[in-house]
């Protein structure tokens, strides 16, 4: 699901809300999450999951075209861990699809 699809689905589900308000709400939430992660804060949404940063140390990589060694600097990457309720819900729905 893309951001546009999420906005459209929410607008359909809540017809009393103006589509522009739904779009603004989704964009505001995602922007606030991005700002929090960029400042090093952890985000926890109970029942859904948590977002935090994982540290990747510097390493020597390879250029796939030339095969030469390339220095890859250290960095932090966003990481999502699904909460228990979400894991159970996904597991249950995948079991129903298999049947």
UniProtKB/Swiss-Prot annotation:
PANTHER family assigned: DNA-BINDING PROTEIN HU (PTHR33175), INTEGRATION HOST FACTOR SUBUNIT BETA (PTHR33175:SF5)
GO biological process: DNA recombination; regulation of DNA-templated transcription; regulation of translation
Highest taxon of source: Bacteria
Residues forming coiled coils: none
Keyword DNA-binding in record: yes
Family: Belongs to the bacterial histone-like protein family.
InterPro entries: Hist_DNA-bd, IHF-like_DNA-bd_dom_sf, IHF_beta
Key words, A-Z: DNA recombination, DNA-binding, Transcription, Transcription regulation, Translation regulation
CDD domains: IHF_B
Subunit structure, interactors included: Heterodimer of an alpha and a beta chain.
Organism of this sequence: Laribacter hongkongensis (strain HLHK9)
Purpose of the protein: This protein is one of the two subunits of integration host factor, a specific DNA-binding protein that functions in genetic recombination as well as in transcriptional and translational control.
Single GO cellular component term: chromosome
Protein name: Integration host factor subunit beta
A GO MF term: DNA binding
Pfam families, per database record: Bac_DNA_binding (PF00216)
Family annotation (SMART domains): BHL
Keyword Transcription regulation found: yes
Gene3D superfamilies: IHF-like DNA-binding proteins (4.10.520.10)
């Amino acid at each position: 699901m893309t951001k546009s699809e999420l906005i459209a689905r929410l607008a359909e589900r809540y017809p009393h809300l103006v589509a522009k308000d739904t779009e603004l709400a989704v964009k505001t939430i995602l922007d606030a999450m991005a700002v929090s992660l960029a400042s090093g804060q952890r985000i926890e949404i109970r029942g859904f999951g948590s977002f935090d940063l994982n540290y990747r140390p510097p390493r020597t990589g390879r250029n796939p075209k030339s095969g030469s060694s390339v220095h890859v600097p250290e960095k932090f990457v966003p990481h999502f861990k699904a909460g228990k309720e979400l894991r159970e819900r996904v597991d249950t729905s995948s079991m129903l699809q298999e049947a």
